[in-house]
Amino acid sequence: MYRLRSFLASAFLTSIICLAGCGEKETVSEKEQPRGYRELLQAYDAGMVYKSAEHKPACCVITFSDNSKLTIFDSAILIHDCTASAPKEVTVSGDWWQVGERILSIRADSSVSDEDAFPVYCYYDRKTLHMYLSNRQHLVFPSVVSDDDLAEEEELARRQNIPVVRIETAGGAGIYDKTNYVRGTITISDPGKLYSDVEELSAPMGIRGRGNSTWGWPKKPWKVKLDEKAEILGMPADKEWALLANYADRTLLRNVVAMKLSEICGFSWTPKMHSVEVYLNNEYQGVYTLCEHKKVSSSRVAIDKKTDFYFEIEENQDETTVWKTSMGVPMMFSEPEVPTPEQFDYVRQLFNDFEKALYSDDVAAYEDYVDVDSFINYYIVQELTKNVDGNFRKSTFLTKEQGKKLEMYHLWDFDLTLGNCGYFDWRVGNGPQNFFIKDFASNCTPGDNWINLMMRDPAFLIKLKSRWDALMPEFEKIPDFIKEQALYLDQAQKRNFQRWNIRESVDWVMFPSLGSYEKEVDYLIDFYTDRLYWLDGAINDL
């Protein structure tokens, strides 16, 4: 340690050895052993553990695990930074050392002790410090970084290199509405092969706007329709895809979290989705969620178009065929888009009979009309996320297959969930407490809805509590899932919020900005955790 301190006190090291390094072309000649070499060797012999190296003007500072430092001046020993590039191959050609393609005038002599040898080639990589000595020794310092740590770091870097979507429209045309497709080409690159073995896919397509209120926000959501079906990022082949902007969600994760909950609950279909970075006509647009568009197909809403029905509950009622049930639930036909008069009459009567059964003296009469398990799963996710749209008002999707009951088939649209809504009724508030789906009707005022009327049935409550308890262990893993997903977005989110200021807001719609991505993610985790444990008690007290 005395020699180490003596070395640190040295103001300048005068002896020079020119070493071939990463990209260096100098010839190395054997001269007087450089000062500082023995101090570095003593640190190695003492078992000091390498932590990091930092190049500064004319020197390199080596830090060990005990935070002691050793300064190596470049005029003494050249220590090369190979953290971002491979080190040179070091071999012996005859009796002479060879670094890369250059043979050095340093003899390889194994009879010489380490103390009397010369450093031939020194470098540090992402793990530790290496020293090749003229006596054929390769000294590798112990490191605070294990192979497992390095593998995890490499995997994280790979995961953070999220796919890139480049959209080129014909003639650079803009995308101005939700009706007319603009022709162009889409290219999806996945250099890290995160989701498939295909690094790049390029295809002709049309693109238009999508969404309801989200279309009016600065960061635009889009729908893409390929000319031919194609697998994208490991998702089943199809023509139709959605690019969700998540402008209102400053974590960029709430839809991803909701689909994880959908997987846990086992809905008949969970839309697959991946975070991507998007460029439109070479202009960066930010982080989007590329996902399967909701539609009837064998890999999505897998029903028979000839005999079955696919419905959407949506207060905007922007499809061709719409109506309201006797309880005022705003319904739309998604498939068929234009039903026959007989089909329309059948469906309206079906929902009227269902709602009449909800008020029946027979509290279990509703079971003749609905797949109870799917409604329980729907309720659990909507209540857990405290979804302002989830009270049979918006973005709710049901199917009626021939010979089967009404089923809550899949989930959709969760950007204003988990504490991110700025317009909850004052009686429920935006905090993690209080029921919302259970107590509020589709017009967002306290009143009857399909779920709370089912809760009149003791058997329904028993099933609900049992299902909740079964799902709870998986629900408790979600905070770690959020942390993982946020870590994967760590680099991309910075670029997103350079493009879209994180402090921007959509008036009263969104929860106010917290000022940083880290705070937004922490808030999401805290809200979810508090909501989970509040509901755990509240549901079991029903």
Give the ranges of each region predicted by the language model.
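Bacterial N-terminal signal peptides that target proteins for export
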Residues: 1-12
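Edge beta-strand at a domain terminus
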Residues: 70-75, 133-150
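Conserved oxyanion/phosphate-binding beta-strand-loop segments in alpha/beta enzyme cores
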Residues: 182-245
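Middle-to-C-terminal accessory/interaction subdomains
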Residues: 213, 217, 335, 341-392, ...
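Internal "kinase-insert"/substrate-recognition segments embedded within catalytic cores
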Residues: 225, 230-231, 245-246, 266-271, ...
